[in-house]
Amino acid sequence: MKKLTIIFAGTAYFSMRYLDALTKSEHKVIAVITQPDRPSGRGQKIIFSPVKILSIKRNIPIFQPSELKNEKIQREIFNLNADMMIVVSYGKLIPKEILTMFPKGCINVHTSLLPRWRGATPIQSAILFGDKETGISIIKMNEKMDAGTIINSVKCNILPNDTTETLTFKLIEIGIQVLLKTLYYINKNIVVEKEQNEKHATFSKKISKKDALLNWNTEAYLLERLIRAFNPWPVCYFIVNQIAIRVWQAKIIPTVMKSACVGEIVAFNKNGIQINTAHQILNLQKIQFPGKKIINVEKIISSKKHWFHIGKII
């Protein structure tokens, strides 16, 4: 069977894992498109994307255009004569001129069961809304965001303690397998395309750091989901003594305390910092002070008892 020649477009660690698998398959990645290098951190040091780092190691030609509407870039991509393009968390729109230039098409690996959770944050959205399952969808791309025909998909259960980080790693493992299987179907010309039902389409929202501030006027179960969805980024936090404290793990205590105010600390012990919310108690178990490591709350019972005394409203 003829090996496929592939142009790969991706940027993040998630993308890099797929690129790594493709370079070890029978197919050939002849070029990579990734986002331009960007300054990061306090020192604004230029950082290469995970996809670029791997591409350098594997001696794969790299394109880093600021946008893909440039005719010169489009000609360069066309002249590579690739069979197809695979897009995994690239982060930029692919114009029609590129989508239509490959004999085998342009496919995208998306981390949801489309048409549910189109957009940039499908994993976080699935956790935030309490979905019991998510998955990977492989779609043939069109000009609309995540609206192409589905050519393969696989389900993945969401466990009660799953975070965006743990769910991402599960989706990487199953996604790589379904992508390789899809390439086999494409190579054999036995792909079956399925239109998405627009009536069932939902859209995930972009997330910013300001969304991570915990609002105790919210029910405990929603806050607990938020903490899992925002782990490992942007990480939920609350303010005490004008200090932002990150929350990495919390559990719901199904108790209603009508005598306590919203945001009031009702217990502080080895089990956690227990805070009254709009409904039920949220028990903070793993937290992080600025510049410090993540710790279990039991580690600060003695040193921070004046910070989290019972009755304090935060």
UniProtKB/Swiss-Prot annotation:
GO cellular component: cytosol
Annotated residues for binding of (6S)-5,6,7,8-tetrahydrofolate: S112, L113, L114, P115
Reaction catalysis annotation: L-methionyl-tRNA(fMet) + (6R)-10-formyltetrahydrofolate = N-formyl-L-methionyl-tRNA(fMet) + (6S)-5,6,7,8-tetrahydrofolate + H(+)
SUPFAM superfamilies (UniProt xref): FMT C-terminal domain-like, Formyltransferase
Matching InterPro entries: Fmt (IPR005794), Formyl_trans_C (IPR005793), Formyl_trans_C_sf (IPR037022), Formyl_transf_N (IPR002376), Formyl_transf_N_sf (IPR036477), Formyl_transferase-like_C_sf (IPR011034), GART_AS (IPR001555), Met-tRNA-FMT_C (IPR044135)
EC number annotated for this UniProt entry: 2.1.2.9
Keywords in alphabetical order: Protein biosynthesis, Transferase
MF terms (GO), sorted A to Z: methionyl-tRNA formyltransferase activity
CDD domains: FMT_core_Met-tRNA-FMT_N, Met_tRNA_FMT_C
Keyword flag Transferase: yes
Enzymatic class: transferase
Protein task: Attaches a formyl group to the free amino group of methionyl-tRNA(fMet). The formyl group appears to play a dual role in the initiator identity of N-formylmethionyl-tRNA by promoting its recognition by IF2 and preventing the misappropriation of this tRNA by the elongation apparatus.
Family: Belongs to the Fmt family.
Record's protein name: Methionyl-tRNA formyltransferase
Originating organism: Buchnera aphidicola subsp. Schizaphis graminum (strain Sg)
Lineage: Bacteria, Pseudomonadati, Pseudomonadota, Gammaproteobacteria, Enterobacterales
Gene name, Swiss-Prot/TrEMBL: fmt
